[in-house]
Amino acid sequence: MKLIIEENADKVAEFAARYVVTKINEATENGKYLVLGLPTGSTPLGMYKKLIEFYNAGVISFEKVKTFNMDEYVDLPRDHTESYHSFMFDNFFRHIDINPANIHILDGNTSDHEKECEEYERKIKESGGIDLFVGGIGPDGHIAFNEPGSSLASRTRIKTLNEDTIQANARFFGGDITKVPTQALTVGVQTVMDAREVMILITGSHKALALHQAIECGISHMCTVSAMQMHRCATFIADEDATLELKVKTVKYFKGLMNHHRSLVMF
Amino acid sequence: MLPRKLKIDSTELAEITNELVQFLNCLVLRSGGLKKEHIWVRNGRILDERTVFFEEKTMADVQIDCEGLILSPGFIDLQLNGGFGIDFSTYNSDDKEYQEGLALVAKQLLAHGVTSFSPTVITSSPETYHKILPLLKPSNASSEGAGNLGAHLEGPFISADKRGCHPEQLVITSLSPNPVEIIEHVYGSTENIAIVTMAPELEGAQEAIEYFVSTGTTVSVGHSSAKLGPGEMAVLSGAKMITHLFNAMQSYHHRDPGLIGLLTSSKLTPDHPLYYGIISDGIHTHDSALRIAYHTNSAGLVLVTDAIAALGMSDGVHKLGTQTIHVKGLEAKLDGTNTTAGSVASMPYCIRHLMKATGCPIEFALQSATHKPATLLGVSDEKGTLDVGRLADFVLIDKNVTVKATFCSGKRVFLAQD
């Protein structure tokens, strides 16, 4: 795996966006679609902004891009400001030239959750699998909504959210905990593991312990992102704050590789 | 299939039918203000872009680059006496001539970004009303011209003292003993009437207001000598508007404010809101008076031009009903007097002047010529906003409110030549 340590969140976003651009251009040159797995949340926001800038500058087109989002709340109207459909539409999709027929977000308003999840896995397979899964992590090391205790072999499914997550989310729902969704549909850990490449974005000191557990401790379902240790091509991009819990030798080791990593996104 | 990318001057925009069109790179006026957004249109209606994206999962057939211009709902003028040499109060000899004049004005208004208007008729004889009113059937905007919202009948039930340019001999100063009978005798059918301006102090006025409201007509108080009391009674009876505030009414007095006092009346409630037309041409309303109105009751401010036949014409002598008007620059005076007639200012001019005189934001000025008049007339579920489902009647303007292009039902119906 790679750990790329950038100075701040803005640099993390820049690196991540450049990496996505590089992958899109490679796929386009090979006459192929690039299939992306996409997250929501404050951490990837910066990456989306950079990608929009690259699009507006004519550096990139999303014409040959397909997307699969990681998760979506259950029983939250699609057009609710906090739904992930809204997040992706407002912060990314409406600003670029992606064909809406090529985007996929789990439908949390379906009456048959199991079928919706099975269909989602089938569509990923039909698209040839995900080329690059971009993700963020929670302070407890969860990836998508695979919270502590989720099976590392899990697939796309409905998940009941834990109390901490619900309380943390209340601030997005007018501080009213009764309005916070209690369930979500989420891709599984194995679904992410099946991707050809995974890129995890981590910023802020509140994620430092999670990063430590993810890369310096053993693989554990109590920290689902630690499964990435077994991924054949995983990249973590962190800012300085997120490395505060890492051993000095770990940080020095990966910083020593930065020139090589930097060359991955030169254009 | 990828979208065809066009600019606003493309000839295709005048002929778009049922294609899915996305207007992008524009500042869209919505209730939250001016925001960089897109507008999606098909079959002449504004679509919900998320529904298009997530349900139809389709890309636009056509994308139109608006080059950073402001995209505002088309302007609405509730008081327009004519323009371009045509006077709505003049009926000469036949219906065809009148209809052609109306159509000419409607067509020319598109260049001013006006997509809806109320043809305004000043005090006239019953014979004239009976001939004109059937010809003023409401219509939607199209490439043929701005849409007709229905007639605005200013008079004849007005104060003789405050008639302004209205012909004295035709003014009717009482609606007693039978207001409904008198109205039907004078106007004929109320079917094509959108607004009636009347003086609330006349005998029988309150009953007349209730009658007009029951027929779906908006009542505006004006050309009046009324004190505040009758004005408040009018509002409680259902009147919703003051006609050209400050003009043709009693001046403000601290022991009886007259109709101007309605702006702060305790009788105003959500059930009885009040709008007022105001002419911000720099002539009819002093800038200081504009500021007084704006700071006293900004929610009720509605821009009207009260423009006459000379709108869009050069200086000279023009007709307004049976009256002769002399025009010089932006001033229009009744022949032989110093009485101000209607204005010769366009709606974009009035919007600009309101901003300059009051310092109000452009969003407020534009809303005062779009959403507010639409709400007042009860047509905001079709016009005056860019909300989903509405008619795609809009105008592209720059920050100086210069009209660059006008669209009706999604088709470009006017393009400014640079």
Swiss-Prot record, chain A:
Its EC number is 3.5.99.6. NCBIfam families: nagB. It comes from Caenorhabditis elegans. Pathway: Nucleotide-sugar biosynthesis; UDP-N-acetyl-alpha-D-glucosamine biosynthesis; alpha-D-glucosamine 6-phosphate from D-fructose 6-phosphate: step 1/1. It catalyses: alpha-D-glucosamine 6-phosphate + H2O = beta-D-fructose 6-phosphate + NH4(+). Keywords: Carbohydrate metabolism, Cytoplasm, Hydrolase. This is Glucosamine-6-phosphate deaminase. It is found in: Cytoplasm. Catalyzes the reversible conversion of alpha-D-glucosamine 6-phosphate (GlcN-6P) into beta-D-fructose 6-phosphate (Fru-6P) and ammonium ion, a regulatory reaction step in de novo uridine diphosphate-N-acetyl-alpha-D-glucosamine (UDP-GlcNAc) biosynthesis via hexosamine pathway. Its main location: cytoplasm.
UniProtKB/Swiss-Prot annotation, chain B:
Binds 1 divalent metal cation per subunit. The active site is at D306. Substrate binds at C165, H166, N247, A248, R255, D281, G282, I283, H284, T340, A341, G342. It is an enzyme of class 3 (hydrolase). One of its GO terms (biological process) is N-acetylglucosamine catabolic process. A divalent metal cation binds at E154, H223, H244. This is N-acetylglucosamine-6-phosphate deacetylase. Belongs to the metallo-dependent hydrolases superfamily. NagA family. It catalyses: N-acetyl-D-glucosamine 6-phosphate + H2O = D-glucosamine 6-phosphate + acetate. Keywords: Carbohydrate metabolism, Hydrolase, Metal-binding. It comes from the Eukaryota. One of its GO terms (molecular function) is metal ion binding. InterPro entries: Amidohydro-rel (IPR006680), GlcNAc_6-P_deAcase (IPR003764), Metal-dep_hydrolase_composite (IPR011059), Metal_Hydrolase (IPR032466). Its EC number is 3.5.1.25.
